[in-house]
């Protein structure tokens, strides 16, 4: 039996948000989690919250039942060879690193290592994440269910059968918050030009995004049908839609998504 139920390599913003979400959901206690961070200041902060802390990432790998790899992708070339030298029973590995493939991790840790790749997005830090998961051949269905249950406490989850889908889905979840932030920024700038305060514009637009999202998720109409329902003939909205269509919004988004996906594949080489 391992000393800790859950370990985190890279207890930065996302890694810490995940472990804290699991603790809030009652999946384990803070003292059942071991967090690695090179920063003494961050280790002290996590220790004050009741977590066990360390500056030795091999200790996390050897003493935890499940290990979350939350370090930056460029740090894997340093960490994987060190973890490969660890002896004893292997943990369940959960990686949130974009572009670090099963093949790369298995080459270092062994093909018999149970690995689940997880792609969360930043709203997870507020408990509103959209997370995608896929398991390798060595991971059992029960292990996938265990990890999915963890991320279900922080938003919604989708499981894919094929690893490549984690690249294909990036524009619609992982990168999508930036799309929405850009759209919000453009709307606020436009509102300010028309004499509306930036704060008021942002409040109104954000609530409109929340309400519109709920209408899409909870209703029985498609996005296209909802657009049509708002666009009264000869009204104001249809004039705005005409400009967006003439300027090629759909084509612009399609090109942006294609570039995003292509870059994800490049990072995985």
Model feature map: region roles:
Residues 1-55, 59-61, 128, 192-194:
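NAD(P)+-binding Rossmann beta1-loop-alpha1 motif at the extreme N-terminus of oxidoreductases
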Residues 2, 206-269:
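NAD(P)-dependent Rossmann-like dehydrogenase/reductase catalytic/cofactor-binding core
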Residues 104-114, 130-168, 179-218:
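Internal alpha-helical scaffold of NAD(P)-dependent oxidoreductase catalytic cores
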Residues 165-171, 223-228:
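Short pre-catalytic strand/loop immediately N-terminal to key active-site residues, enriched for Gly-Thr
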């Amino acid at each position: 039996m391992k000393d800790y139920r859950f370990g985190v390599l890279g207890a930065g913003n996302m890694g810490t948000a995940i472990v804290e979400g699991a603790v809030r959901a009652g999946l384990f206690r803070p003292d059942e989690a071991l967090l690695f961070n090179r920063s003494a200041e961050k280790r002290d902060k996590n220790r004050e919250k009741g977590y066990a802390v360390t500056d030795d990432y091999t200790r996390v790998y050897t003493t935890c039942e499940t290990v979350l790899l939350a370090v930056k992708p460029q740090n894997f070339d340093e960490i994987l060879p060190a973890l490969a030298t660890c002896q004893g029973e292997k943990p369940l590995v959960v990686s949130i690193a974009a572009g670090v493939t099963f093949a790369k991790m298995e080459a270092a840790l062994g093909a018999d290592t149970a690995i689940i790749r997880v792609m969360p997005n930043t709203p997870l830090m507020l408990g509103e994440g959209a997370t995608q998961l896929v398991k390798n051949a060595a991971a059992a269905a029960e292990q996938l269910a265990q990890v999915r249950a963890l991320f279900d406490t922080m938003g919604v989850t989708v499981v894919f059968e094929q690893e490549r889908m984690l690249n294909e889905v990036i524009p619609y979840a992982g990168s999508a918050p930036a799309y929405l932030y850009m759209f919000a920024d453009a709307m606020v700038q436009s509102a300010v030009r028309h004499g509306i305060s930036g704060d008021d514009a942002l409040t109104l637009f954000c609530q409109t995004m929340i309400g519109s999202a709920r209408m899409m998720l909870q209703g029985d109409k498609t996005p296209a049908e909802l657009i049509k329902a708002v666009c009264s003939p000869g009204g104001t909205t249809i004039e705005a839609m005409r400009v967006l269509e003439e300027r090629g919004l759909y084509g612009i988004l399609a090109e942006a998504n294609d570039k995003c996906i292509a870059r994800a594949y490049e990072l995985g080489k």
